[in-house]
Curated annotation (Swiss-Prot):
Keyword Hydrolase applies: no
Function text: Component of the TRAPP I, TRAPP II and TRAPP III complexes which act as guanine nucleotide exchange factors (GEF) for YPT1. TRAPP I plays a key role in the late stages of endoplasmic reticulum to Golgi traffic. TRAPP II plays a role in intra-Golgi transport. TRAPP III plays a role in autophagosome formation.
Top-level taxonomy: Eukaryota, Fungi, Dikarya, Ascomycota, Saccharomycotina
Superkingdom of this protein's organism: Eukaryota
Record-level GO BP terms: endoplasmic reticulum to Golgi vesicle-mediated transport; intra-Golgi vesicle-mediated transport; macroautophagy; retrograde transport, endosome to Golgi
Identification of the protein by name: Trafficking protein particle complex subunit 31
Localization: Golgi apparatus, cis-Golgi network; Endoplasmic reticulum; Preautophagosomal structure
Note: Present with 8350 molecules/cell in log phase SD medium.
Acyltransferase keyword on record: no
Species name: Saccharomyces cerevisiae (strain ATCC 204508 / S288c) (Baker's yeast)
PANTHER family assigned to the protein according to its UniProt record, in alphabetical order: 41-2 PROTEIN ANTIGEN-RELATED (PTHR20902), TRAFFICKING PROTEIN PARTICLE COMPLEX SUBUNIT 5 (PTHR20902:SF0)
């Protein structure tokens, strides 16, 4: 017959149900008060991303991360086609998110930027004050007073967002040329800190366009003429266009010219439905 183990100085009321161990997401129960558990701390992630700030990752860190992605795919993929497809899928997941971010960011008027910056700084100070008030090392009376005042300010900002400073959303791009110019300028500047070197329409097929980059940033440390590693950027372009309502296929081609040995052309082939839709809408 099994025997129940009774812990010293512990009653049944303290342990009403079965426990799997220490709850790391909550922490020690005696350190959490009912007031602290109900405190709402508004997230600044979305507001910060809407406000344009030059936040750059170091090239060495990005190159190291990209190298690890390539190494992992080389170990798991059996064919070059499988490698390019999976690498493109990685970029696709980024591209579908960049459309909304850049559209919202382009909709914040320049006159609202000073007020938006002030909003973020006030929101940050309120969050820090709330975190300090919930720390277990403070005295009980001062913690209660500080937490109450912090909660009042947080409740006021609970419904606020940087999106309130957007008075008019940027119009959605409906033409192929408009969305490609947005990629050529805004998207490329966001990703690589410069616009792409050229945007060309094919003279042979009406559904083919080309974006040219004379000096690809991510693959500049990868020697050789193999363009398989460029399919990460192909995936970003494809995901961006797919989320914008322009389904297509994107491939990469190495075409050296002049002194640019790594000059890469990203060939975009739109589905026939995109051309038919544009012909019906705009003639």
């Amino acid at each position: 017959m099994s025997q129940r183990i009774i812990q010293p100085s512990a009653s049944d009321q303290q342990f009403p149900g079965k426990s799997d161990g220490y709850e790391y997401t909550v922490g020690p129960k005696q350190a959490i008060t009912s007031e602290a558990s109900t405190t709402y701390i508004p997230s600044r992630i979305y507001s910060e991303s809407l406000l344009f700030k030059r936040q750059e990752a170091s090239l060495s860190a990005m190159a190291f991360l990209f190298q690890e992605m390539i190494s992992q795919l080389h170990r798991t993929c059996k064919t070059a086609g499988d490698f390019e497809t999976k690498l493109s899928d990685y970029g696709h997941n980024i591209g579908i998110r960049l459309l909304e971010l850049l559209n919202f960011r382009a909709s914040v008027s320049p006159s609202s930027l000073p007020r938006a910056s002030a909003f973020l700084s006030q929101n940050e100070s309120s969050s820090k004050l709330s975190n300090a008030s919930n720390s277990p090392g403070m005295l009980a009376n001062s913690s209660t007073a500080t937490s109450a005042s912090a909660n009042e300010r947080l409740q006021e900002k609970q419904t606020e967002s940087l999106s309130n400073y957007i008075t008019k959303m940027r119009r959605r791009d409906l033409k192929i040329l408009d969305i490609l110019q947005f990629i050529h300028g805004t998207l490329w500047s966001y990703l690589f800190n410069h616009v792409s070197d050229d945007l060309v329409k094919s003279s042979e097929r009406d559904n083919e366009y080309m974006i040219v980059d004379n000096f690809p940033t991510l693959t500049q440390f990868i020697p050789g003429e193999n363009v398989s590693c460029e399919y990460f950027v192909c995936g970003i372009i494809k995901g961006f266009l797919f989320n914008a309502g322009f389904p297509c296929g994107v491939t990469a081609h190495r075409m050296p010219q002049g002194g640019h040995s790594q000059r890469t052309v990203y060939l975009i082939q739109f589905d026939r439905q995109v051309l038919d839709r544009e012909g019906l809408r705009f003639g």
